[in-house]
Structure formats: C-alpha cells, structure tokens
C-alpha cells in the first residue's frame, strides 16, 4: 500500500489464529492502521491477497460485514447523538445483537447514556466505540487503540472483556501503543516497522533473552546532568541505558551480581540515593526498543 511516494505497507504477510488475541505493534506511521483497514475492507490492496474468515474483504464485503466488529480510531459516531441512542442504532443493524443495557453496564456507559457524543470524555468515547464493535456478536473483532484515553479502571475492565471474548471463541486483533497491554493480553504479537514485519511470536518467545535482563533504577531526586552517559560508561559498552524520566533509568545488559554492584557503586560515587533497584527479565517494551529504536508515548525518553 502506497500513498504518493510513501509506502505504508510493504509486502507484509501475517496470519491470525482463530479464538486468539493478536497484537499488531509498531511505531507511529509503521502501517498498523493501514493494515487493519485493509483487512476490514476499507482499503483495497494494491497487490497480494487478503482473506478474513476465508472471505475477500472487498469482493465478499456483504457476507463479511455481519461477522466482524470494528472499533475505529475516530469511533464513527455523530457529534450530537446520545451514547445509548448510537449503541441501539448499531444493535438494530444486526440480526442477533447483544443486550445493549447489559453491554452499556459492562463497559460503564450507563451514567452517560443520555450524554451527546461530543460531550463524552475521551475514555467514554472509547468505551462506546468498543461497545459498538461488540454489540453484533462478531466472530472477529478489530480494535484500534482500545484503551486510549481510559483511566486505569476502564483499562482493566476492557482487558477483562477482551479476555472473555477470547474464552467465548471470538478472535481479537488489536493495535496499541501500550506495550504492557499487548504483553498482558496477546497470544501472538506481530511487530511491524516501515510497513514490514520485523518480529513475530508469543510475548514469551519475544522476551526470552537468555542472560539479558533489565535493571530499573529509581532515585529520590532528579538525576544530575549527564547521568545517563556517565552510568553507561561505568557499566561498559555491552550495556544499554535508557533515561525514562528525571528520576528513573533502565539498564539492559548481562544479568549478574556485577551489574547490580556497578550500579550501586555509581550511585555512591555520584551522590545519588536509590529509592529502588530492581532486576527483571526483558519486557516487550525492551524488545520493541531493540527492534525499532523507539519508545511509544513516553515523552523525553532518551536511549543509548
């Protein structure tokens, strides 16, 4: 798929297992949304073959649409429509919809059911968009950034609902900027960059890194200038140091007592008081950083 002289999706090949949750990850502009929109039938592929539930999303659109649910980034609701009116309207388009009152209560929409769409908070709009995607009892649901703008409780509720869908045999394909969300939910993860697949596997397969681990250092006061580079030099060239914010850094490298001792010694020499020093396995975020060199959403992150 190209837009002018820009290639959005370049020879991408992926498959999704029935009854699973699959996460499609990548930096901004990697081609995630274009990929999903092609699978949903909103864009015609310029080459290659796309099959969703065995059907061509373009040629077999009428047969496919009743079997899938789509949560759009823009939600697709009129600005003046009330939340419950919109959900009931979508429900009437399906032969055997879910009970709208149950779905609204499940997603915490009851209190804003009479509120016009334009007055809903970002999180409420997201929850309404998810409800609209699910009300038709889809076999396959595409969710684009399902928890963006939600508070922690709303995010957890959405996670529970997506897990319940998987238990009921529904296939879920999601994109997300929250790498913790992908690691928590996904059975399979596809990471794409510049329209190409660069990694694929289960979260465990992708994060399994032998002796490589992460050390997270949180201190009581902001780091002094040049702290990141200073710590990297103290640890050696085989270690990566990422400044997460003014009081925390992540060290990725060999998992042994020597690494922890060097970090502690650096803190002492630089008069930095640790609040916590923790050792853990590589996360999906670490893998993403290694593969793309980018960290989503975290402003001011520096990576060496």
Which role fits each region the language model picked out?
Residues 159-254:
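ABC transporter nucleotide-binding domain
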């Amino acid at each position: 798929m190209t837009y002018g002289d820009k290639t959005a999706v370049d020879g991408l090949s992926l498959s999704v297992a029935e009854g699973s949750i699959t996460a499609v990850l990548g930096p901004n502009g990697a081609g995630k949304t274009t990929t999903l929109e092609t699978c949903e039938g909103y864009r015609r592929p310029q080459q290659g073959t796309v099959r969703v539930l065995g059907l061509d999303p373009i040629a077999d659109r009428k047969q496919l649409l009743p079997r899938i649910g789509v949560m759009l980034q823009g939600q697709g609701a009129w600005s003046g429509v009330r939340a419950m009116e919109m959900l009931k309207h979508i429900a009437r388009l399906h032969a055997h919809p879910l009970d709208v009152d149950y779905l609204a209560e499940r997603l915490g929409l009851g209190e804003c059911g009479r509120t016009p769409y334009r007055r809903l908070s970002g999180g409420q709009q997201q929850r309404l968009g998810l409800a609209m995607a699910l009300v038709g009892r889809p076999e396959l649901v595409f969710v684009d950034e399902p928890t963006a703008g939600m508070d922690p409780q709303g995010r957890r509720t959405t996670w529970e609902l997506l897990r319940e869908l998987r238990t009921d045999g529904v296939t879920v394909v999601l994109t997300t900027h929250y790498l913790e969300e992908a690691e928590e939910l996904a059975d399979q993860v596809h990471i794409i960059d510049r329209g190409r697949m660069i990694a694929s596997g289960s979260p465990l397969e992708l994060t399994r890194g032998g002796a490589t681990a992460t050390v997270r250092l949180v201190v009581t006061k902001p780091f002094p200038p040049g702290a990141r580079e200073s710590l990297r030099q103290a640890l050696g060239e085989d270690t990566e140091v990422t400044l997460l914010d003014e009081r925390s850094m992540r060290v990725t490298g060999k998992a042994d007592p020597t690494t922890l001792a060097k970090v502690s010694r650096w803190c002492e020499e630089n008069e930095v008081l640790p609040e916590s020093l923790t050792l853990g396995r590589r996360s999906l975020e670490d893998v993403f950083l290694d593969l793309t060199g980018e960290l989503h959403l975290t402003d001011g992150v520096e990576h060496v």
